[in-house]
């Protein structure tokens, strides 16, 4: 059976009302990629409250983006100068007090740690490493969908309530 498989879930409501008229649509039942990367089969879902306010969650891939934090801060300082640039950076990142590196086991976290140490030049934050996994991504690749996935038949429209988890 043909199907369209997405690697992201609700993602800031960007997938709401999504519908495929002729093909089955499959996507992870997660409100954002952070929840998905923190999920581990052997532990299960973390409650939304475990995703801490004030934490900026990062992975190695995040640091490879040419518009990631360091290049962004450098660009702001270059355009606006030191004083105004620092104010702008504070407005963007001021509510974050901790950067949580998600160790999914898919890459060497040491390189990520080095990057985060450089981030401290721009932000006054603590840095920690938290355990995550690629369990959901592996299920996407294998097609081994479980109750962590939403499967829509052709013509079905994606609704926010489909992302709700039945608490046990």
Feature names for model-found ranges:
Residues 1-4, 58-73, 152-168:
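Extended, charge-rich low-complexity interaction segments
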Residues 5-8, 26-30, 58, 128-131:
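General beta-strand structural signal in soluble alpha/beta enzymes
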Residues 17-20, 112-114:
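Short amphipathic alpha-helical segments
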Residues 88-168:
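Extended, basic/helix-rich recognition subdomains
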């Amino acid at each position: 059976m043909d199907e369209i498989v997405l690697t992201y879930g609700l993602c800031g409501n960007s997938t709401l009302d999504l519908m495929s008229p002729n093909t089955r649509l499959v996507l992870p039942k997660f409100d954002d990629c952070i929840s998905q990367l923190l999920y581990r089969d052997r532990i299960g879902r973390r409650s939304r409250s475990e995703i801490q306010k004030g934490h900026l969650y990062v992975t190695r891939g995040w640091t490879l983006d040419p518009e990631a934090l360091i290049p962004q801060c450098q660009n702001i300082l270059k355009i606006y100068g030191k004083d105004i640039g620092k104010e702008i950076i504070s407005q963007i990142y001021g509510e974050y007090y901790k950067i949580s590196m998600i160790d999914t086991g898919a890459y060497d976290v040491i390189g990520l740690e080095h990057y985060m140490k450089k981030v401290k030049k721009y932000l006054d934050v603590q840095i920690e490493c938290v355990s995550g996994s690629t369990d959901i991504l592996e299920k996407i690749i294998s097609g081994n969908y479980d109750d962590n996935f939403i499967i829509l038949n052709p013509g079905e429209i994606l609704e926010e309530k489909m992302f709700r988890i039945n608490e046990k």
